Amino acid sequence: QKQLHTGFSEDELERLRRYFLELKCSVAGRFLWQLGTATVDRLGLASLQNCAFTVIDSPIVPFTWAMDMLALGAGVGYNLQKKHVDKLPPVREWFKPPTRVNDGGADFIIPDSREGWVRFLAKTLKAAFLSERPEKGTFTYSTQVIRGKGTPIRGFGGVASGPEDLVWGIGKISDILIKRAGRKIRPIDALDIMNIIGHIIVAGNVRRSAQLALGDCDDIEFLLAKRWDLGNIPSWRAMSNNSVACDDPRDLHEYFWHGYEGRGEPLNFSGCV
């Protein structure tokens, strides 16, 4: 009650205790796992969520928030319809990938924490989308304080993956952004960035990284994003289940049905949001 701030009366608490003891009700497994721990004191309800959702309509927070929630174990859904992704500014023409130097003189020494990894992603996205002059379009970083691979992780459990998966992921995200220099990113680019974030978290050896992407029913690139039979599809796209927003099934593009014919993976559809 103190951690969740439920405001139950003593009578309500007693009744709830009785229901638990009589096995008439229960709470989610994540509550059983974490309630009463310092993790909940520090993170609040965020660490107890099974599901989360965001809209990709700004250049930083949707991605960093998704990374944070995935690292906490929540499944994350996200809307990347063109009407939302178009709200992001163009990628700066002077953006360059951050450079790893691994010494105390780096612009950013990545903290050995979930929050530190999220801040590294945020700095990269800020350099790409929001930097105001060329010298701010990149930065140097160090991974020297990140625990080595195989080191036990206290708190959420598991073992550390070391810094290499994070370095790989930020490099891949930077590659995607550089290809769009001077232009806005497309929904397929937003999907790739989210999927790479998911891959980083899976590689981090703590969570499985469940994602659900919601795109436009006429976005050909999105509809073909997981057509493995076409070849040259990035493996990280396996990180998300993909769905399309559509008011009328008759508006669905023919490519939508290919997944049900054994070509690629079948998509679901839902009403527009």
Indicate residue ranges for each PLM-predicted region.
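Extended catalytic cores of very large enzyme megasubunits
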Residues: 1-273
